[in-house]
């Protein structure tokens, strides 16, 4: 019995696209000799940060507050002597309109006892770019199979299998799409007004890989 010849190929594609969102992390801190006053001061500064972020309206996609903490400061060389208390909080802001990013970071950096880290550029988890990359990888696999078949005077006739990388051989863990999220700047608050910071969105690399197996017509072998 003659087995119909097959072709196993890997399709892959890398897309370079603009980011869809930018994430900025804002650390808020307060220090006082009294624990209650330290917490009250933290609450006041945290509220100011939240108000500044929310004032940007639709440009901000999401605002999230992290857990707050307060701990005593001990005098050097002692275990029990408390000299004051430090309270900390964190706010994470996700921005979709990058035109407000510079003003927001510069404004936040001007707040007392506030540290700004970011932005981190990325795509949304449900970004259509990810689907586009997967489809392009599948199309690349088909094109490769056709080229290989054509080299032997044959044509592709049927798709047998299409799978994430490694699954055809039950080997590697699948890894279809990932996005490179790069580009970060840091701005730490000072009492003086900060110069306006400029941010250039960093392109995101989205890579998709698929394995495929096709059947083809009988090859024409010379010689």
Q: Can you say where each PLM-predicted feature lies in the sequence?
A:
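Short, charge-dense linear interaction motifs
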Residues: 1-223
């Amino acid at each position: 019995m003659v087995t119909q010849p097959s072709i196993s190929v890997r399709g892959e594609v890398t897309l370079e696209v603009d980011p869809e969102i930018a994430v900025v992390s804002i650390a808020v801190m307060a220090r006082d000799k009294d624990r209650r006053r330290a917490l009250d001061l933290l609450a006041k500064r945290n509220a100011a940060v939240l108000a500044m972020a929310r004032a940007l309206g639709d440009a901000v996609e999401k605002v999230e507050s992290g857990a707050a903490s307060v701990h005593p400061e001990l005098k050097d060389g002692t275990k029990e002597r408390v000299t004051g208390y430090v309270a900390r909080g964190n706010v994470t802001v996700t921005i979709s309109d990058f035109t407000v990013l510079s003003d927001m970071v510069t404004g936040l950096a001007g707040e007392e006892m506030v540290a700004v880290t970011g932005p981190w550029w990325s795509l949304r988890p449900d970004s259509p770019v990810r689907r586009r990359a997967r489809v392009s990888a599948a199309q690349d696999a088909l094109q490769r199979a056709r080229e290989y078949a054509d080299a032997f005077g044959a044509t592709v006739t049927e798709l047998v299998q299409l799978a994430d990388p490694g699954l055809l051989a039950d080997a590697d863990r699948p890894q279809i799409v990932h996005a490179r999220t790069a580009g970060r700047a840091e701005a730490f608050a000072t009492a003086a007004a900060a110069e306006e910071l400029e941010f250039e969105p960093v392109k995101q690399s989205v890579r998709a890989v698929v394995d495929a197996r096709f059947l083809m017509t009988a090859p024409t072998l010379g010689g």
